[in-house]
């Protein structure tokens, strides 16, 4: 299963993926926020993270955004849960779940309860494919892209 990453900005994103115009439009409209975009990866991303594509987003949580800005490089960012289990929203539950498997848990306060991010696959240049619908609706994504394409004509 590919490991998603967070990036600080478009410049950082372009260092690790081939960011097409469709992706740039979605980044401009919806990010920072709960939208993850899959794009063809560049060779700087190891195959151990993902083989052909990379899913990335710009986080809206101030601590996550500060961490990736200060690191100066993308950071892997999986959800705070075990696969196929519900997400964890408190550091206490994360500690109980992961105490034997991680070296550090950063307490950034209680996380907002929301669905996991929307995931859009833009690896094929033709059209976006919604992999998972979350807080950013498929309808709003398609509407934004239609408006943009109408402007370009």
Which functions belong to the PLM regions below?
Residues 1-153:
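Active-site-adjacent structural elements in enzyme catalytic cores
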């Amino acid at each position: 299963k590919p490991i998603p990453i967070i990036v600080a900005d478009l410049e950082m994103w372009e260092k690790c993926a081939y960011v097409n115009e469709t992706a740039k439009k979605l980044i401009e409209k919806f990010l920072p926020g709960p939208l993850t975009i899959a794009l063809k990866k560049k060779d700087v991303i190891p195959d151990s993270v993902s083989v052909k594509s990379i899913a990335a987003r710009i986080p809206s949580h101030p601590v996550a955004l500060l961490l990736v800005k200060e690191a100066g490089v993308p950071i892997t960012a999986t959800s705070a849960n075990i696969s196929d289990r519900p997400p964890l929203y408190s550091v206490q539950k994360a500690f109980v779940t992961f105490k034997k498997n991680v070296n550090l848990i950063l307490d950034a306060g209680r996380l907002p309860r929301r669905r996991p991010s929307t995931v859009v696959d833009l690896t094929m240049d033709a059209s976006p494919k919604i992999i998972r619908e979350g807080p950013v609706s498929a309808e709003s994504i398609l509407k934004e892209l239609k408006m943009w394409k109408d402007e370009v004509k």
